[in-house]
Amino acid sequence: MVSKFDRDWARRHFEHVLLLVRDIANPSPQDPYFPTWRHKDWYLGFSWASGIVTARGLAYPNGRNQESVSESINAYEAVAIYGEVMAEVFSGSRNYKDLKNYRISQRINDMGRLLFGKPITPTLIYRSYTRY
């Protein structure tokens, strides 16, 4: 990840990368530009490959649009790592904008960890279950 190794780049492109994060992990229903949790269906516990509903606003028949676990955990882990790295980039600054971005980065990390934890937890449980 470029942000981890080039902090100047990370600061210059924070808002641009934040747009990508908001596209898949936006927690705010007040955001007029991106849907809330584009792929994550918290009720069913799945991530959907093309979003929660079809272009016509209908659910996908037979749930045939479920995201593969490997794709979703990689996307959500990337969100968590980005938040962690950017919190490091902005930590220690006395600048108001940097403090604001530090708090945003912490929330990004929290969102990514929450999103990542949902599909990975059952995987770890099944893997450790040796009865069968």
Language-model segments: residues:
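Soluble or luminal CAZymes and related metallo-dependent hydrolases
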Residues: 16, 71, 111
